[in-house]
Design a protein with these regions (language model features):
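Generic hydrophobic, aliphatic-rich segments that mediate packing or membrane embedding
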Residues: 19, 23, 31, 49-52, ...
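Metal-associated gating/positioning segment near the N- to mid-region
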Residues: 1-30
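Active-site neighborhood of phospho(di)ester-bond hydrolases with catalytic His/Asp-centered motifs
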Residues: 2-8, 37-39, 65, 146
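Short, glycine/serine-rich, charged loops/turns that create anion-binding
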Residues: 10-11, 42, 68, 96
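Acidic-histidine catalytic/liganding microenvironments
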Residues: 30-32, 164
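Active-site mouth loops of central-metabolism enzymes
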Residues: 7-10, 36-49, 115-123
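Histidine/acidic residue-rich metal-binding segments in metalloenzymes
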Residues: 50-169
Length: 170
């Protein structure tokens, strides 16, 4: 491994410039891999108050994310995307509706059933993804969507790209 994107859900959360600077300093000192910190989109990943993205970029962050913690308040999500768009920062989001996904641990389907795992319905991903893409259309935010698991989600991504939304995915 030569490069690592470090998500913000560390302990402590990567929501302060000093923490990011320390992470970059330690990684450089070890000289084992290139480290690319992904800063917290909101303070403490709580989804309430925006982090100081400009300061976090100065400290070394390459993008912003909520890690596995969705922002439930779409007003906060919109403000975060608008702020990120103003500076050209990329926002990484995992599309999952926490209410529809409650109790699930894997994409709902044949494999989950065979393994006896409680499933997360595709609708959980699609509904959250639709919201994220609409907010990106409205704000001009650059998105990276993580951990997609359904063909319908890929179709939404393709349509958004055709409409001019700057979105990548994995």
């Amino acid at each position: 491994v030569t490069s690592l994107a470090i998500p913000p859900d560390t302990d402590p959360v990567l929501d302060e410039p000093g923490l990011v600077e320390m992470l970059c300093y330690r990684a450089k000192k070890l000289n084992r891999a290139h480290v690319y910190p992904v800063g917290a989109l909101t303070i403490g990943l709580k989804g309430q108050q925006l982090s100081e993205m400009a300061e976090l970029v100065e400290a070394g962050c390459v993008a912003f994310s909520q890690a596995n913690t969705p922002i439930l308040d779409t007003r906060v999500l919109g403000r975060a995307m608008q702020y990120a768009a103003t500076f050209g920062f990329r926002v990484w989001l995992q599309p999952i509706d926490p209410h529809l996904a409650r109790g699930g641990v894997a994409h709902d389907g044949e494999v989950a059933s065979r393994l006896g795992l409680p499933g997360i319905p595709a609708s959980s991903e699609i509904i959250a993804l639709f919201t994220y893409l609409q907010m990106a259309r409205l704000t001009g935010a650059r998105l990276h969507i993580t951990r997609l698991s359904s063909a319908d989600s890929l179709a939404l991504i393709d349509q958004a790209r055709a409409d001019g939304v700057d979105v990548t995915c994995d």
